[in-house]
């Protein structure tokens, strides 16, 4: 099953805050508004005023002002007790996708890959300690899933995350390693620093990552990088399946070659577009 657990063990308001310190150009009220939006999630789709204030660290009065502003703008609704995001919030996320024309080119390649391998395919980028899904093509098999565009998962324990982490400069990787969550998601989870460094080094050398039930029992996936014209890794693509019908050997022998062909094709499209980033 592909059930999202947590992102990085933090509340949405805490997750992967920018290490940059606010300066004169920092608009605190705007930042607080974003924190309020991020406090809503699959685990907290509806919240009271007190819950929003607790999740964001704001006072009740401050949280109320922001919620009422968002409600006036149409991004939040309320029944008088509970607040929830409205579909209009999708405009903010789709602005990113619509401003990134590569995904209009990548999606057909991903759909073709799904047709070939009969497994789901996703693309993600790295944001702090998380991978953020920016495109997902589902297989037609009947299965439970709540992963979609905008979903976040802990980078150290996803195949796409390890591909993206493997491309980081050593100092950035060390900084993220020091901040990562210290727990095992399953009995298969790699938790030690030495284990994770060794695995990420192996991913860097071989150019792809395979994870077998480290984040969730029953979930197996393989991922490879999408690179720009300079050879820089800017995103990752994966194929995910269920371990009870997809073995590591099948992933390596049958699915990996097709995944690598797809990432090469998408990388070529990115290079041809002249864009350096997604």
Per-segment meaning from a language model:
Residues 2-104, 108-111, 264-272:
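N-terminal helix-turn-helix
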Residues 217, 235-278:
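Juxtadomain coupling helices with adjacent low-complexity linkers
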């Amino acid at each position: 099953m592909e059930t999202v657990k947590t992102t990085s063990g933090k509340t949405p308001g805490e997750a992967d805050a920018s290490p940059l310190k606010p300066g004169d150009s920092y608009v605190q009220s705007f930042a607080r508004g974003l924190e309020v939006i991020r406090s809503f999630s699959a685990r907290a789709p509806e919240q009271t005023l007190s819950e929003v204030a607790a999740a964001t660290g704001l006072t009740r009065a401050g949280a109320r002002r922001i919620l009422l502003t968002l409600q006036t703008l149409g991004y939040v609704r309320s029944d008088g007790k509970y607040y929830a995001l409205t579909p209009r919030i999708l405009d903010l996320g789709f602005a990113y996708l619509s401003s990134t024309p590569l995904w209009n080119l990548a999606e057909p390649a991903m759909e073709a890959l799904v047709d070939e391998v009969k497994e789901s395919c996703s693309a993600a980028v790295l944001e702090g300690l998380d991978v953020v899904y920016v495109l997902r093509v589902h297989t037609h098999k009947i299965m439970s899933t709540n992963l979609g565009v905008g979903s976040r998962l802990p980078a150290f324990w996803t195949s796409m995350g390890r591909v993206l982490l493997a491309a980081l400069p050593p100092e950035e990787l060390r900084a993220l390693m020091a901040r990562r969550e210290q727990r095992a998601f399953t009995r298969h989870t790699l938790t030690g620093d030495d284990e994770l460094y060794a695995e990420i080094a192996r991913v860097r050398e071989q150019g792809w990552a395979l994870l077998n039930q480290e984040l969730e029992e029953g979930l197996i996936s393989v991922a490879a990088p999408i690179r720009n014209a300079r050879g820089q890794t800017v995103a990752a693509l994966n194929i995910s399946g269920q371990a009870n019908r997809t073995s590591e050997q099948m992933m390596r022998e049958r699915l990996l070659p097709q995944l690598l062909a797809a990432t090469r094709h998408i990388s070529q499209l990115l290079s041809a577009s002249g864009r350096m980033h997604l």
